[in-house]
Amino acid sequence: IEGNSAANGGGVYIKSYNLKMTGGSIINNNATDSGGGVYFTGSSFNVSGNVSITGNKKGATSTGSGLNGGTDNNVYLPNGKIITVAGALTGSNQIGVTTENTPNNSKYVQIASGNASNAKPEKFRYENDGAIAVSAVSGSTTKLVACKHNWSSEWTADTYQHWHVCSICKGKNDPVAHTYDQTVAEGSYKAFDATCVSPA
């Protein structure tokens, strides 16, 4: 789907149905309002395989040989709508996502979900704010979110790793495997026991 234009959903406008992409391209389309590539307000939007949704714009001008100006607006998600990653995304292009709501200092915005082996944050790009990278938050399913992280200065740990937690989305930052290589100190000199992140 290429070279189309509309007020909303220059390439595809899904209002009350499902959209399933297991490959194919939605490229170089334009919308005057939202969703240069896809405007999705339907029931489910599943993606997998070699999907390419890129080069779509909002407010661009068609030159006959392409689009000039405008802003990146590949997939537009109104409040509460997300993409489901139904299988591995094998394409080389990131899927750009623009959301109606935006993250703030107390709230993240979810853009996608799927199992941990398929929902990879590097396959997506958040278009509302290029400084915000898409992050993965693990649970029964993996959520891909746009978040203005507020990382704790304290360490959280399990049996194998330690990391810092975001107070907003509860995501992990800089997980590090325990090494247990702290210098051994005589018991009489210890203020407290050594851990994997601090010496005795």
Residue ranges and their predicted role:
Residues 1-3, 18-30, 46-55, 86-89:
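Right-handed parallel beta-helix
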